[in-house]
Every structure is written in structure tokens, then in C-alpha cells.
Amino acid sequence: MDQNVNVLLFGSDPECRAAIDVLNGLDALSAHIRQHRHLSDLEELEMVLVDWSPTLLLVLADGAEGMECVYRAKERRPSLPVFWFSDDRQFGMQSYRLNCAYFSIKPVTPENIHKALQRCDHMGIRYAK
């Protein structure tokens, strides 16, 4: 891996903590996570995207809030890879329209993080099982 990874997570505190545990459990990724931050407020998200350069965004918010998060993030940083984990499969088509790198139904698992990372080879992240 060529770079450190700055991960921005958006969702509830328990879901973000669980996702961080999954990320930290992936040896090929955790050694390169330099910093992670998690948010649950859309206005704060917009401010963070102005001041900080995340490598990727994990969206864990349910329903329309998750879609709004993706929309705002893509508006600010169109090339930011977004992994969107939702409680509703119906948002899959929206994730495609918003150019998300990956969409899956919750929960966040090592397997679906692995699938998501495979779609982001340009990040230089490799996952070894």
C-alpha cells in the first residue's frame, strides 16, 4: 500500500464504532489507517469536507439521511470514494446514480468491506484474507 488512509464515517455512534472495529480487524488495512473520524450531523459533515481530506467515506446512516449524506459529500468532493451501507435495499439505485464506489445492506462485515476495497484499487489498498 502506497498511502495512509483517512476514513470518515457518517452514522450513529454505535454503528460507527462497530465499523471501526471491522476496519481495524483487517490487517492489510488497519496498519495504514492514519486517522478516522465519525460524524452524525450533516452540517458538520460539510464543514469537515472543506477542512479535511478523507481518503474514503463510509455512510452508515439509514434511510433518506444516508442518501442526503452521500449527496452532500459528492457535491463537495465528487471523486471521494463512498461506501454506503443502508438498511434499505431500495437506495442501491440511488447509490449508482450518485457514483458510490460500493453499496450494501447492513451490517458492515469484513467480507463486504473487502468487496468495497476491491472496487477502489486506485487507493492502493490490498486486503489479504
Tell where the protein language model's regions lie, with residue ranges.
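Conserved phosphotransfer microenvironments
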Residues: 20, 42-46, 53-76
